[in-house]
């Protein structure tokens, strides 16, 4: 199993190219199931999750190629990928596939909308009553689907097609909004999505669906209107830049000090995070090429944050920002409002010398003068990169274990940081 070795204390200086957004790429790829024609996606990141989803889509009959050549289960997804679901060969998504990636549950919407039936395994680890797919199921039922949950599978049927309706989410849900958009695009009549997620990745999906012939208005606002159409066509679409990757490297630059250009990053996608970095003591400039982040040795200041749906501070940057605050001059308060149990990185940061106290959904971080390298273990995607950020400022060597979590969401992380002066290497075995 791979590990990443980091020797801290080096400034970061250089250019980091921001990849396409994983959180946009996955629903865009799933949208290929809505049409028999080819959907071409450019700027797909070359990530474990992207390549796994290609395998899952292939199970349903999606053919994928790059530069006109059919490839295996793990293509070089950094080039334009052509996805063609000419024939849906299976409307069942089995547990052994869905359990590998939670987002793959979203295939239920296009399969149901196009074929009138879908049977999809509940994602691994879902507890009845608290599972995040409840709102997705509610959206499908509002559109007229009959849904049964049996033996760990969600079986949805709409033999006469889906019918437009008002879908009012009790809380903001990105996955629910993705599901509603894809299903409503092929439903009969008008659908209104109320309390819709406003995330840029939702807007990106809507823009792609419109290119495919969908009639959608209001994406990026809390109310979205969809007028269903009989069929969707193929299209070409470029995945938007990854705001979470950009925010992560911006935080890394603030942590290590130095001068980093985030090429291709769009400030409008992560303004709340950039504002917080400025409060903490970094200098942030938006230029034609992207975003430039600098910190010249001045100490970090403590800043309180509360995670919130877009345009608030993203929960996917919470762990990274906590790592930054471990070196601030004073106490910061971090409140997590989106996900339960998203402080799994705290114990591992403590192994590096961080002082963090937990009280429910609040973490109180008392900044320390020095962090010290140590062996640590990644528990999930965002937690793993928070350990890398802390290690950049720690004295001595840090070994991050279980880095397969990193590979799910960060393209060539050690190469990008190493190119800016970090002492970082991947060790196999």
Curated annotation (Swiss-Prot):
Pfam families: EPSP_synthase (PF00275). The modification 2-(S-cysteinyl)pyruvic acid O-phosphothioketal is found at residue 126. Belongs to the EPSP synthase family. MurA subfamily. GO terms for biological process: cell division; cell wall organization; peptidoglycan biosynthetic process; regulation of cell shape; UDP-N-acetylgalactosamine biosynthetic process. It comes from Methylocella silvestris (strain DSM 15510 / CIP 108128 / LMG 27833 / NCIMB 13906 / BL2). GO terms for molecular function: UDP-N-acetylglucosamine 1-carboxyvinyltransferase activity. Keywords: Cell cycle, Cell division, Cell shape, Cell wall biogenesis/degradation, Cytoplasm, Peptidoglycan synthesis, Pyruvate, Transferase. The active site is at 126 (proton donor). It is an enzyme of class 2 (transferase). This is UDP-N-acetylglucosamine 1-carboxyvinyltransferase. It catalyses: phosphoenolpyruvate + UDP-N-acetyl-alpha-D-glucosamine = UDP-N-acetyl-3-O-(1-carboxyvinyl)-alpha-D-glucosamine + phosphate. UDP-N-acetyl-alpha-D-glucosamine binds at residues 102, 131-135, 316, 338. It comes from the Bacteria. Its EC number is 2.5.1.7.
């Amino acid at each position: 199993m791979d590990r990443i070795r980091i020797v801290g204390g080096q400034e970061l200086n250089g250019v980091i190219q921001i990849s396409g957004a994983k959180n946009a790429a996955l629903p865009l790829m799933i949208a290929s199931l809505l049409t028999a024609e080819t959907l071409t996606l450019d700027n797909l990141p070359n990530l474990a999750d992207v390549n796994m989803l290609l395998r899952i889509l292939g199970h349903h009959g999606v053919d994928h190629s790059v530069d006109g050549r059919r490839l295996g289960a793990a293509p070089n997804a950094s080039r334009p990928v052509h996805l063609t679901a000419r024939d849906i060969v299976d409307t069942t998504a089995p547990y052994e596939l869905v359990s590998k990636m939670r987002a793959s549950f979203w295939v239920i919407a296009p399969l149901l909308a196009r074929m009138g039936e879908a049977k999809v395994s509940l994602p691994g680890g879902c507890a009845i009553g608290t599972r995040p797919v409840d709102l997705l199921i509610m959206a499908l039922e509002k559109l007229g689907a009959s849904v049964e949950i049996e033996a760990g599978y969600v079986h949805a049927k709409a033999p006469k097609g889906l019918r437009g309706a008002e879908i009012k989410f009790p809380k903001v849900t990105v996955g629910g909004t993705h599901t509603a958009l894809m299903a409503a695009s092929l439903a009969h009549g008008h659908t209104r999505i109320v309390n819709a997620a406003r995330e840029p990745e939702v807007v990106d999906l809507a823009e792609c669906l419109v290119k495919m012939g969908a009639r959608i208005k209001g994406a990026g606002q809390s109310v979205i209107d969809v007028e269903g159409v009989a069929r969707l066509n193929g299209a070409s679409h470029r995945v938007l830049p990854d705001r979470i990757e950009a925010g992560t490297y911006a935080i890394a630059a603030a942590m290590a000090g130095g001068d980093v250009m985030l090429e291709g990053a769009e400030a409008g996608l992560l303004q709340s995070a950039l504002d917080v970095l400025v409060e903490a003591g970094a200098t942030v400039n938006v230029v034609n090429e992207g975003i430039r982040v600098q910190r010249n040795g001045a100490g970090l200041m403590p800043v309180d944050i509360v995670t919130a749906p877009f345009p608030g501070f993203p929960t996917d940057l919470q762990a990274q920002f906590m790592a930054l605050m471990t070196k601030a001059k004073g106490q910061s308060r971090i409140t997590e409002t989106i996900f339960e149990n998203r402080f799994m990185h705290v114990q591992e940061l403590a192994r590096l010398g961080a002082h963090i106290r937990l009280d429910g959904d609040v973490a109180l971080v008392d900044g320390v003068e020095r962090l010290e390298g140590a062996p640590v273990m990644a528990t999930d995607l965002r937690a793993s990169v928070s350990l890398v950020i802390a290690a950049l400022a720690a004295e001595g060597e840090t070994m991050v274990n279980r880095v397969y979590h990193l590979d799910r969401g960060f393209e060539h992380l050690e190469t990008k940081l190493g190119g800016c002066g970090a002492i970082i290497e991947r060790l196999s075995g």
